[in-house]
Amino acid sequence: RRHTRSFHVTGVQTCALPISLGVKPRDAERSKNFFALGLVSWLYSRPIEGTVQWIESRFKDLVRESNLAAFRAGFHFGETTELFEWPFQVRPAQLPAGEYTNITGNTALAWGLVAAGQLSRLPVFLGSYPITPASDILHELSKHKHFGVRTVQAEDEIAAAGMALGAAFSGHLAVTTTSGPGVALKSETMSLAVSLELPLLLVDIQRGGPSTGLPTKTEAADLNIAMFGRHGEAPLPIVAAYSPSHCFTAAIEAARIALKYRTPVILLSDGYLANGSEPWRLPDVSTLPDISVPFATEKNHVNDDGTEEFWPYQRDPETLARPWAIPG
């Protein structure tokens, strides 16, 4: 109660008011969300022309007319009632000059993975099992086969992680996507990736929990399982995105760390970032980092007797990463 004293609660009859303006009761119940949208549009001083055009193009006949009536009723209710002292002003964002597009977090993350594949000169492999709110990454990546992206929809979370780990072993930029409960199911594979020292990205689009939780609600509460949710001593890096557009940069950074240090990496996003959108300035490709790493193709150790052999865990003195040798 103490925290709500600064709030003013105003009740609005979202069905009764449209009915008083001639909307049929059944249509008013269906259109009450548009009444609320009209009221919010007035409260935040937003122009309504674009919304009106969208309603006219999206709906037909009586549904269109009832939605338009409810939307306008909500807007004019806010304009004429004395329940609200003042509207809010949403000022245009101050953005640097450049070419922009509107992008969601999941789309930005998928594009970041495609970019990471190009920057590393590796084919991208995604092993995924559909789960809200991470499924859009699978949908988006499946559109980019012309960039060497391979996507597999597995039968379950464990199989998806296992496929991705196998792809990492064979020289791919390997990714598996999931949300909260899927992180638990993939934990054994992630432990194996730590032991094998293979670059594997686990993308966790967090949702409300625990357990199956609330798939359509957002929550950023998986840091604990990301840090400690593996058996034995199996530490790994964690990268977290902070905005929808930052998901692009975060994906490239997670891939860079995984490849350079030969380690699995967990990339954290959440439902709010995944489905939220914002203006994104298209990057200058020439400014993106080169994250390519060489495969081991030659023997790397000389024995006391002068013979040479390959040591799979010979350490790089700078990164302490082992050589990445692929089969064949």
How would you label these PLM feature ranges?
Residues 1, 16, 177, 203-205, ...:
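Generic beta-sheet signal
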